[in-house]
Regions:
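A short, active-site helix/loop in glycosyltransferases that binds the activated sugar's phosphate group
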Residues: 238-271
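Conserved catalytic-core segment of nucleotide-activated headgroup transferases in glycan assembly
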Residues: 275-331
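Nucleotide-activated donor-binding/catalytic signature segment of Leloir-type glycosyltransferases, i.e.
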Residues: 327-344
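Short alpha-helical donor nucleotide-sugar binding micro-motif in glycosyltransferases
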Residues: 351-356
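Short Ser/Thr-rich beta->loop micro-motif in glycosyltransferases that lines
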Residues: 360-364, 386
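Short hydrophobic beta-strand element within catalytic cores of glycosyltransferases
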Residues: 381-384
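A charged, aromatic-enriched C-terminal amphipathic alpha-helix characteristic of glycosyltransferases
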Residues: 411-441
Length: 441
């Protein structure tokens, strides 16, 4: 340990802040973990209690609002266009920029803007955070390859620069310049800066977080890897180090995908070290056993909708969209058991998830409002077609059918006597854990 006055505490260190990292973070918090959470991600929309190793040095400008797509600064006479999936910046007929939205996309909140040169190669990316200010800028070479990224404080001063060619990281702090050879050194410096010593490190990657663990002083050999990658035909080299007992601090591996865990055991991984562990989900409600079916779509291409509506006259179909609906879809108003919600607001969509007890993932094109996950969290029984399914993580494999076998879907919906059992199976397929499972880690 580098200093006796440091706070000794368990730490959760995440490689990025994608969906599975968020689920791990939420599982820890729900289970009562009150230690610090850090990430190598420079995401500008992190929860307030998650610290980026980069943007920590930029300070906070709280109270501002996230930037809407038409609030991007552009030269006079340039035009900004947007849909529910992204935006573009035009100079007459020339596309000069591309706008990427933060999730949920339909709110059109700006996350990143790519700026193109005259050959339509991205040369600069501007990064905006949840307070609406530009906190980072990425530079690309003329081939569109990453060169560097700078991070700024609220006054626009450059605080951190990462060179993607040399992998060096430069920190400008208190009129001094610090140079770090890699992200691992940089992360360790942040721990020192905050007077934190990780007594246990919980982490989810064999990349940077693993090397941070290996570079900390060994105390009790109690660090834990949460393995979130999918099925693969071999055991990763750094994982083998842990399995062979050669890691300085890590002694346990929790695998968060069933297929990946089964394969690791098949490959000879020690069952005492490698164990399955899913997530603690915050379920919003219980299934009420009503006859309400929900479909969320921005497309009028809904597989077998007509057949399902006709074959199940006693079921109420609620079809919602963030956009206006085409005449093709509006024509379903002729059925007494179909209710359409064009231009649906967030509050209305939430009410539908609370009202309905079945979700059909049968629409083509992109998924909206993270509908499959929301259906899962609201305990709707989820069914879909192979041709349309968006997120298999939360769906029982035997409830995903070929569209030609839609009658099998109907039989499951009609079989109300097995609804609770099927919901329990659905929760199991998503590896649902309870709070005590995480307290025992």
């Amino acid at each position: 340990m580098e200093g006796s006055c440091m706070l000794e505490t368990p730490v959760l260190l995440l490689e990025n802040f994608d969906e599975e990292s968020q689920m791990l973070y939420q599982s820890f918090r729900t289970s009562g973990f009150d230690g610090p959470v850090f990430t190598f991600s420079d995401e500008g929309f992190l929860p307030d209690d998650v610290t980026s190793i980069y943007t920590y040095y930029c300070g906070k400008k709280e109270g501002g609002k996230a930037r809407y797509f038409n609030q991007i600064d552009v030269p006079d006479y340039w035009e900004i266009k947007a849909s529910n999936s992204g935006g573009q910046v035009f100079d007459l007929n020339h596309e000069r920029g591309k706008i990427f939205f933060a999730s949920p996309l339909h709110k059109r909140i700006v996350k990143i803007v790519d700026w193109y040169d005259d050959t339509h190669v991205a040369r600069v990316s501007d990064h905006y955070n949840k307070y609406g200010f530009l906190y980072a800028r990425t530079i690309f070479n003329k081939k569109g390859q990453l060169v560097s990224r700078s991070y700024y404080d609220v006054s626009g001063n450059e605080k951190v620069v990462e060179n993607f060619v040399t992998h060096d990281i430069i920190l400008n702090q208190d009129d001094k310049v610090y140079i770090f050879k890699n992200k691992v050194e940089f992360a360790k410096h942040l721990f020192t800066e905050l007077d934190i010593y990780p007594t246990r490190l919980f982490y989810n990657s064999l990349s940077n977080p693993f090397f941070v663990s290996e570079n900390l002083e060994d105390k009790e050999h109690s660090d834990v890897l949460f393995w979130q990658e999918g099925y693969r035909e071999d055991i990763p080299g750094n994982m083998q180090v842990i399995l062979d007992g050669h890691s300085r601090r890590t002694s346990k591996i929790y695998v968060q995908k069933k297929e990946a865990h089964e394969k690791l055991i098949e490959l000879g991984a020690n069952r005492d070290i490698v164990k399955p562990l899913g997530f603690v989900y915050n379920f919003e409600k219980e299934n009420q056993h009503t006859n309400n079916i929900l479909i969320c779509t921005n497309s009028d291409r809904i597989e077998k909708l007509n057949e399902l509506v006709v074959c199940m006259p006693n079921m109420k179909f609620h079809v919602c969209a963030l956009t206006e609906m085409s005449q093709k879809l509006m024509s379903f108003e002729k059925y007494d058991n179909v209710h359409l919600y064009p231009g649906c607001k967030a509050s209305e969509i939430l009410n539908l998830f609370n009202t309905c007890d079945y979700y059909l993932d049968i629409n083509y094109e992109n998924e909206i409002v993270d509908a499959t996950k929301e259906a899962f969290l609201h305990n709707l029984l989820i069914l879909g077609f192979n041709q349309t399914i968006h997120n298999r993580k939360y769906v029982l494999p035997d409830f995903v059918y070929d569209a030609n076998n839609y009658q099998d879907m109907i039989r499951v919906i009609f079989d109300a006597s097995h609804l609770d059992m099927n919901l329990e199976r659905q929760r199991n397929v998503a590896m649902t854990q309870n709070v005590q499972d995480y307290k025992n880690v």
